[in-house]
Amino acid sequence: MMVALLTVALAHAGPADLTSGDFGTWEDALDAEDVLTPEELAALEERGASAIVGGWDVAAGDWGDTAGIVYRGMEVGCTGTLIAPDLVLTAGHCMDGVLGVVVDSVDIGDGSGEWIRARRSIAYPRWWRSYDVGLIQLESPASVAPRTIAQDCILDRYMYDGAEIAAVGYGAIDERGTRYVDELQETRLEVTDHDCSTRDDDCIRSVAPGGEFIARGEDGTDTCFGDSGGPAYLMTDEGDFVVGVVSRGTRDSGARCGAGTIYVRADAVVPWIEELSGYDLARPECPDGPPPEDGLSDLDDAPGNMRINGEDIRGCSTAGGPGALGALLLLLPLFRRRD
């Protein structure tokens, strides 16, 4: 898949009204004959799959809720996050032709992980000028634990300019988006604008402030093409929560990766998710007492640490501004490249 630059004229209209019933319409997934077998998944060695710029291989057992989005023709085109047993959150621009997902895999090329067919999918209404998110409902529940969305006290205590996030995905590993590996990648990035209030030219005004945030790493470390829809995890004393969904590169990025990424804040779309799915999503439990002075204390050094209420549960969880916006969508090059 070629690098995708999307230029759109952004209207000043706001996002879909969550009180009016304007939630969009679910679309059925592809027909049954398009479903991949385990043997077909194991045969994906021809692909040019992908990873994060400046990252490292995810260890087995970490970030099992990170999903590779599979399309017709055995193609992986985006990344996502399992937020309920049968619900994956990803980018709105990743919704065309979804076949299913692979979760609980750190190397898609070896056929490992759990393949689950999609039942239906939906993009946020007018995602290109509001929230660039989409949902995939699965045919059956995943066996790995879903990730809780950062909300309420977790955001109050840990989401600020300078906070550290973990970015995980199946995107390119070089700034030009030409080199790929089979292994799931992760890295650490710094939040530079936690509510998209200081970089107005990079953010979509209709959902700012509070609908998006910006993060970047040192020495060009960043998400890249193929990480679209993937998770940004906020690491806290209370566990690791998904706080963002990869949308696009900043204006400084041009056609390269490494200058920062704009994320949709996951908490901003919780009402939409709950209305469409009928679920009451899990919420973090707020601890007593003030937050740590530096936002973190005594976190495990191991990547992908996942603790809820102080209990390590890794054993059951393998874990645009106004006018014309040159929005660099971080689409993942495919298992097989589309003609």
Feature locations, PLM:
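Hydrophobic h-region of N-terminal signal peptides that target proteins for export
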Residues: V3-A13, L331-F335
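Protease-domain processing segments flanking chymotrypsin-fold serine proteases, especially trypsin-like
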Residues: L10-L89, V98-S105, G109-G111, I122, ...
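C-terminal subregion of chymotrypsin/trypsin-like serine protease catalytic domains
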Residues: S20, G77, T81-M95, L99, ...
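Chymotrypsin/trypsin-fold serine protease catalytic domain
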Residues: G24, A29, T37, G111-S121, ...
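Active-site-proximal beta-strand/loop segments in catalytic clefts of secreted hydrolases
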Residues: I69-R72, I83-P85, A91-C94, V103-V106, ...
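Short, solvent-exposed loop/turn segments that connect beta-strands within catalytic domains
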Residues: M74-E75, G109-S112, R176-T178, T236-F241
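Terminal processing/anchoring signals of secreted or surface-associated proteins
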Residues: C316-T318
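A cross-kingdom C-terminal cell-surface attachment/processing module
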Residues: G321-R338
